Amino acid sequence: MTKEMTENQRLCPHEQEDADCSSESVKFDARSMTASLPHSTKNGPSLQEKLKSFKAALIALYLLVFAVLIPVVGIVTAQLLNWEMKNCLVCSLNTSDTSQGPMEKENTSKVEMRFTIIMEHMKDMEERIESISNSKADLIDTERFQNFSMATDQRLNDILLQLNSLISSVQEHGNSLDAISKSLQSLNMTLLDVQLHTETLNVRVRESTAKQQEDISKLEERVYKVSAEVQSVKEEQAHVEQEVKQEVRVLNNITNDLRLKDWEHSQTLKNITFIQGPPGPQGEKGDRGLTGQTGPPGAPGIRGIPGVKGDRGQIGFPGGRGNPGAPGKPGRSGSPGPKGQKGEKGSVGGSTPLKTVRLVGGSGAHEGRVEIFHQGQWGTICDDRWDIRAGQVVCRSLGYQEVLAVHKRAHFGQGTGPIWLNEVMCFGRESSIENCKINQWGVLSCSHSEDAGVTCTS
């Protein structure tokens, strides 16, 4: 063993130095790697620990691989050398046995002794070869480790640069996130302000709309009252016109009577002049006397004899239109006339709209109880707030020009079926009764004894 150690030291005097150099290079690499790490980062200690553990794991892995491979290679090479040496000795012995005679067998013992010595030398040589191969492998390993350490240093430097850039980018992103959070906070504040403003505006708008609706309802009531007053004024005007017409008739009669009396007086005066004598001579014009007091009216004289019928006077003012007379009896149907020529073919007309209002129970189609068609059924209208304007709308919707009168208390008889409407408020300009202001369809607080009716101009 001492020989082997001396031989190893002799053959490999620099092996210990290489090991020291390799350890120093490892220390230097570790120092350089630790020195190149950033100190000012927040995640510095954990990253350095990770890199140190990574280095230790790599070094242990390489040492384990070298420790396993080197003995295997040495054993294989030793077995190959032994096998070759044995083959060579056997071949030499065979050749010597065949070539030499029996006389030389005494030298075989010497040869065997030499062979054993040679074998021992061969073993020593094998051990030296193994030590050389081991030292060579160590040298190769140290070079590879240095190269690997350099490559790892470069990679680590690149990784550190990338980490620095990542850290700077993360810091920038953090700053941008802080700015974004601040802007979001300001936006939240502005949104809260906007919500408060919108709520206040909504409250104001609701109040203003409520006030406007109240004002509109008041205006509608006023308009309704004014229209009712106007309608009542129109009715009073019609009554006044009728009274004026009657007064005019009375005045015409009085004027006729006065004319007749005037004519009678003129006739009496004519008769008196016939009885008197001839006129005397005209005397001198006397002084004008004082105006006397007006005497009392004289007693009416006796009515004289009616005179001769006078000339026809001027045409007087036309009198008022009298009430319509009773309808006459229908006349006899006349004989049919000759058949006329065939007329031209007319164009296709549009579909006539279905009537939703009708008059029932009157003397004709122009008057009767007002019935309205709704939900597939005919029903009546209650007479609450039923006035001339609603009748005007009904008459116009049926094709008549004006309304003559409106009727309440089932004037044309009580209807059947549902009572659809109540308290209908119309302005008189609507096209149909459905366009008037209607509270609801279907009335339960009214009976058919209050059905409304109307009379239109025929």
Curated annotation (Swiss-Prot):
Point out residues bearing the modification Phosphoserine.
Answer: S32, S36
Q: Where is the composition biased (Gly residues)?
A: 316-325
Which residues get glycosylated?
A: N94, N107, N147, N188, N253, N271
Extract one GO molecular function annotation from the record: cargo receptor activity
- Where is this chain primarily localised? membrane
Stretches the record annotates as Spacer: 79-114
| UniProt superkingdom | Eukaryota
Q: How does it sit in the membrane?
A: Single-pass type II membrane protein
Stretches assigned to the Extracellular side: 79-458
User: Could you tell me where the Low complexity compositional bias lies?
Assistant: 326-339
Q: How does it assemble?
A: Homotrimer. Interacts with MYO18A.
This protein's name: Macrophage scavenger receptor types I and II
Source organism phylogeny: Eukaryota, Metazoa, Chordata, Craniata, Vertebrata
- What gene name does this entry carry? Msr1
